[in-house]
Amino acid sequence: AQDSRQAWQLYENGEIDYAACAKHINWLIESGVHGLLPLGATGEFSALTLEERKAFAEFAMKEVAGRVPVIIGAVSTNVDVTLEVAKHAASIGADGVMILPPPGLHPSQDEIYAFYKHISENVTLPVMIYNNPGSSGVNILPETLDKIADLPHMGFLKESTGDIMRLTRAVDELADRLVIFCGCESLAYESFVMGAKAWVCVLANVAPAQS
């Protein structure tokens, strides 16, 4: 299965061009993507206010209209913002939320576990654990992922270290608890060979049928 990390369009004044975004969403779905992930890093969530993020999530859910699953990006340096986005995503019928360790704060492994534990106690949707050292500044180690996978509401792992051995280990050790997603463009084929179930794909924004 292939999910598209959805990019979005802006007017020159910085406002979201919802008409262009609607056209893009429909094109992606008609081209065969199996899911959408709005408000991820590719979607430049950090350029939006909390209210703009909520408004875009509502727009995306309405435009998709149940045709494919939607996982909403809920990344923030502020855990309260992450939880607010996650709770809002649940209220509008999203299928899950993607959550990265707070970027730029360089938490320890114990702090990462405590973060996801707090998340698990305050969400109702399935959580996509996002392991991307390039974005967060920290690598969630296999031992920590093993503990996180046992928490309530943990449903998916997006593995974006760029290390096929890490993804292979995740499949071997976590696939009975989490759905493993490849999060690296250059390793999609290898990831499927090694047992990943899906690919969160940036390239699909411009070439969905070929991705």
Give the location of each predicted region.
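Active-site beta->alpha loop and helix N-cap motifs at the rims of alpha/beta catalytic domains
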Residues: 4, 9-137
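Catalytic alpha/beta core domains of metabolic enzymes, predominantly
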Residues: 121-122, 133-211
